[in-house]
Regions:
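Catalytic-core regions of core metabolic enzymes
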Residues: 1-710
Length: 710
């Protein structure tokens, strides 16, 4: 990854693992400067801490220095808690001292929404680039090395003894050191680091995630992001996380923003910005969740669970109602609770002796807290169809001990606990937390978490062998065609030119002829074979059907002549005259295929995106589509096809033959390579409909429209 350097890693390492800390703006008052100093001083036995403030000789019992340059050593990190107007001066002093890392708590930059604030932040960013002093912030709450109890943070909350393997990165400092930290403490979820990135004038969310990929103490990365400073960089980080098998779990806000924009094609109208992010995160293995609790619970589950050996879920509970509700929630989200095999069923029935019954989910009634409970868990765990064990109970001390022992006995099997008792601290619940048993408090959240665990490892197993597709080289013929059409920037190309373009990338198109008079139209129809379709080949009018510019099912010469005259008239009424009308296209009718849409759009943040969905004129009504970033491989293409509800028609429906799904997948791959190779110059592309013919007969593009941009 070209954006990642040794200096960058070293600077972040100094922020998170400092041996010396300077707090500029340190104060005896417990405002930001005072809290930051107090937090740092908790590690003063291991870390040299230097208050810097010319107004004091001593702060909080520690000698205070007038400036960074007056310090007895070069600090690993300088914490800046001064007015926004003073920040650049402090950064310059720090650079003169040789410091390579700064955490800027100060606010008053771009978050103010003023030009003055934006300009000041731009100056901070420029200083970081030119000096090599890397900056977290401004307008952040700092960072914390939780596992080593070193807090470079202006938060009033600490968390002694909370060290663990979940690395937390948040753009919002108030969220990082507020609800996330509070919930982690309450739930006993151990963290390795807490990082707030603030306005990201220099280092951004992706930089810190990238650092955590190299950190052996961090098994899972949890994040809260409002928007990516560089979305493509995050995608590269996500790819690297997949290669290393380190999960990223993310809250990405903005689900309610539909990203509506003026667009000429169906594809752009169907592709909201959040839908793009959702597709991209899924494509690269990032687990997207909705809220604080879900983020931490899923992160805790993945950090304390091996990959399930099977997809089946075994549920054991002391309550028939709870076990049934849990099974219902699991079933709704697509999890499987297999029937017990003979050995498990007979073994459990032997233990229960008529009090309850052997099933999955298993209601063990009065035996839930007995000495027999470990045997029941073990019988279920030994069933090879079971990959994950769930215990649902209000649990006492003895049962918590038994569950912990079961986890230690079968370390290769994920185990989760659905706690049904009071969430007030009890000995049993406390034991489970301290033993790092993943605990959930509602059946739906448990089901969602286990779904994420299974899906992630399934996805990882596939990507671990196939990797990610690369953009292939564009050939000379393709480049020439694209270069010629790029001069039409912003204009919706005619169908004839759009089809000619996609044909260069191996997309099959209908047989057709562009004519200028009725006699030639009749001759072309005779050569193609009746029935035929006829269309006015116009520019800048992508939805031809709405303007009466498409005639279908023409069966003879008389119908062709009549259609020619009508299309010319309708084109004139639509304003398509002169250079706006290339002619009338006579085309073969494809009548035995399934209509689908294949499209491309380009997003300035994420790049080229391919869309697949149910096709035809009603595509925007049904919005039955799947998205991926380009390029894709064939397995991605097959996943996209499976994601679309209307794709059932491709499998054969009510006596219709199965369609050529293999050829469709190949076409999706070709179009994705085209979009990736053109890298933004192709703004939009619709192939709608693409006709998927019966198995073995391929596909044909019956219509297409492309839009280029400079």
């Amino acid at each position: 990854m070209t954006t990642w350097t040794a200096d960058q890693r070293s600077s972040i390492h100094n922020m998170l693992n400092p041996r010396s800390i300077a707090v500029v703006g340190a104060s005896p008052r417990m405002a930001y400067g005072g809290r930051m100093l107090a937090a740092a001083l908790k590690a003063s036995a291991r870390v040299n801490v230097y208050p810097v403030n010319p107004r004091y000789e001593e702060v909080q019992g520690v000698k205070c220095y007038p400036s960074v340059t007056a310090l007895p050593e070069t600090p690993d990190v300088v914490c800046v808690v001064v007015s926004s107007e003073q920040v650049l001066d402090v950064l310059n002093e720090s650079h003169q001292k040789g410091t390579k890392a700064a955490v800027v708590i100060s606010a008053g930059f771009s978050e103010r929404g003023t030009q003055e604030g934006r300009d000041l932040q731009a100056q901070v960013a420029a200083f970081a680039r030119e000096s090599g002093l890397r900056i977290s912030g401004p307008n952040c709450l700092g960072l914390a090395n939780v596992k080593d109890d070193i807090w470079v943070s202006a938060s009033s909350r600490g968390a002694e003894g909370l060290g663990g393997s979940v690395g937390l990165v948040c753009q919002s400092g108030a969220s990082a050191f507020g609800p996330f930290l509070n919930r982690a403490i309450d739930s006993g979820i151990g963290l390795s680091y807490i990082i707030s990135t603030g306005n990201e004038a220099d280092l951004d969310f992706s930089d810190f995630v990238r650092y955590l990929l190299d950190d052996d103490d961090t098994k899972v990365i949890a994040g809260f992001v409002e928007g990516f400073k560089d979305a493509k960089k995050f995608i590269e980080v996500a790819k690297l996380a997949a290669e290393r098998g380190k999960p990223i779990i993310l809250i990405k806000i903005g689900r309610s923003e539909l990203g509506a924009k003026a667009a000429q094609s169906h594809t752009a109208a169907l592709t909201g910005l959040d839908a793009l992010y959702d597709a991209a995160l899924t494509q690269y293995g990032v687990i997207r969740v909705s809220d604080y609790d879900e983020l931490l619970e899923v992160a805790n589950l993945l950090s304390n669970s091996p990959a399930p050996a099977a997809k089946g879920l075994a549920v054991v509970s002391h309550s028939g109602g709870i076990s049934s509700l849990t099974a219902d929630m699991c079933g709704q989200i697509g999890l499987d609770l297999p029937v017990l095999n003979d050995a498990a069923r007979d073994g459990i029935n032997g233990v229960l002796k008529g009090f309850g019954w052997a099933s999955n989910p298993s209601d063990v009634t009065g035996f839930a807290n007995s000495d027999s409970f470990p045997e029941i868990m073990q019988f279920m765990a030994n069933d090879p169809a079971m990959g994950t064990l769930v215990v649902a109970s209000s649990g006492g001390d003895s049962q918590a001990t038994q569950v912990i022992a079961q986890r230690d006995l079968a370390k290769e099997m994920p185990l989760a606990f659905l706690w049904t008792g009071s969430r007030r601290e009890t000995a049993g619940l406390d034991m489970l937390k301290k033993a790092s048993i993943p605990v959930f408090y509602t059946p739906n959240r448990l089901a969602s978490g286990i779904r994420s665990l299974i899906d992630y490892h399934d996805w990882l197993g596939h990507r671990g062998t196939s990797g990610f597709p690369e953009t292939t080289a564009i050939n000379a013929e393709q480049q020439a065609a694209a270069t010629k059409l790029a001069a039409t920037s912003g204009i919706a190309l005619s169908e004839h030119h759009s089809k000619g373009l996609i044909a260069k990338w191996g997309v099959p198109i209908t047989r057709e002829s562009l004519v200028q008079n009725a006699d030639d139209a009749v001759a072309a129809a005779g050569e193609i074979g009746y029935p035929v379709a006829m269309k006015a080949d116009v520019i800048n009018l992508p939805h031809k059907t709405d303007a009466g510019l498409v005639m279908l099912g023409l069966k003879d010469g008389a119908a062709v002549r009549e259609a020619f005259d009508m299309l010319k008239s309708n084109a004139a009424q639509a304003g398509a005259v002169g250079e706006g009308l290339n002619g009338i296209s006579v085309q073969e009718m494809v009548v035995d295929g399934v209509e689908v849409i294949v499209g491309v759009s380009y997003d300035s943040q994420l790049g080229a995106t391919i869309l697949f969905g149910s096709g035809g004129v009603m595509v925007e009504v049904y919005n039955d589509v799947a998205l991926r970033l380009c390029p894709i491989d064939k397995s991605d293409a097959l996943e996209m096809i499976a994601d679309v509800k209307g794709a059932r028609l491709l499998e054969g429906f009510r006596g219709r033959p199965a369609a050529d799904i293999d050829a469709l997948a190949d076409t999706l791959v070709r179009v994705s390579q085209m979009a990736a190779q053109l890298d933004g110059s192709l703004a939009e592309l619709d192939i709608n409909p693409l006709m998927v013919l019966p198995k073995g007969q391929g596909v044909k593009a019956a219509d297409a429209v492309a839009v280029f941009q400079v």
